[in-house]
């Protein structure tokens, strides 16, 4: 590939994001400067935080401007480097732009050199071994200190962190009940994620349940 494809913001999002809010742009592949390295992005994480960056309103991050490249956590591989700490072939997790190739430097946000385990797909590092999985694991074990035989109730159970929390709790021998916002999500967490039961907070009586 000789060009760098980028997903850019075509218009601000006011409700649920639609395809027309985004556009595809192409440009040259950048060259790393001194202390930088070029990353070939392989996987991106669809983070809830991105929604807050594409509405034109400032929050803890500056909003992405119209025409700006969408950003989010990614996993990629170094293909060219002028940084002694990152060499060609290294796998890297970082907050990058949604593009084929990104320039990174040592002080990039969330930058981490990965040491992939044999047999573990690299995509897991933006999923179950990424932020969502870590949040679920720490919340259950370090904060909740769950024990086998307990009942664990998970809110937002169909989301990234909630679905991971439910599956981890099941593996630990707990009964798991998930709270979701639709019958479709209720069926999903029971049939696909292995929850014992689901509550649709929009239609079910949570107190009675």
PLM segments and residue spans:
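Short polar catalytic/cofactor-binding loops
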Residues: 10-15, 44-46
């Amino acid at each position: 590939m000789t060009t760098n494809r980028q997903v850019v913001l075509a218009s601000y999002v006011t409700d649920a994001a639609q395809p027309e809010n985004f556009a595809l742009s192409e440009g040259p592949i950048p060259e790393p400067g001194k202390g930088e390295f070029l990353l070939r992005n392989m996987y991106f994480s669809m983070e809830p935080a991105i929604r807050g960056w594409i509405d034109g309103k400032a929050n803890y991050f500056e909003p992405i401007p119209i025409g700006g490249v969408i950003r989010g956590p990614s996993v990629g591989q170094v293909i060219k480097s002028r940084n002694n700490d990152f060499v060609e072939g290294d796998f890297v997790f970082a907050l990058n732009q949604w593009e084929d190739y990104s320039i990174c430097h040592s002080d990039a946000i969330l930058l981490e050199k990965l040491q992939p385990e044999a047999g573990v797909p690299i995509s897991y590092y933006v999923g179950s071994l990424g932020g969502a999985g870590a949040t679920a694991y720490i919340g259950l074990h370090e904060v909740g200190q769950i024990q086998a035989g307990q009942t664990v109730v998970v809110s937002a159970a169909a989301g990234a962190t909630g679905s991971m929390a439910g599956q981890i709790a099941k593996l630990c021998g707990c009964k798991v009940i998930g709270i979701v916002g639709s019958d479709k999500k209720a069926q999903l967490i029971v049939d696909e994620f292995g929850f014992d039961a689901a509550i649709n907070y929009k239609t079910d009586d949570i107190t009675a349940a």
